[in-house]
Amino acid sequence: MIYFDNAATTKPADNVIKTFERILNNIYGNPSSPHSYGHEASDIMDKARAQVARYMECLPEEVIFTSGATESNNLAIKGIVKRYKKNGKRIITTKIEHASVLEPMKELENEGYDVIWIDVDKSGKIDIDQFKRA
């Protein structure tokens, strides 16, 4: 089989699968728990966070693990909106975003944010004139 939907998900590398399987089978404590299983899970998460931080050239405390794209998009959108609320309540987005972006935008619109929905052409390119007017 040839898989063409890598925009939605991509098969992890074999070494990632092996590591993940080993951890799932042997280290299943809640990293927030005070017992030894929790400490072991927490240590592994800390190590992974440090590795990602080195790769991304950021601080480990700037790395946040989420369960997937929807949670990540919600966290990013809502976090940025809260952080920059003092700069205004206008948000510009397109009408063809993934549902994990569209839904929080609709929520923000219902909360009083001025969400500007930019049209796109048949190729998915935004209407530049509409964007400039926004």
Segments predicted by a language model, with ranges:
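Pyridoxal 5′-phosphate
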Residues: 1-134
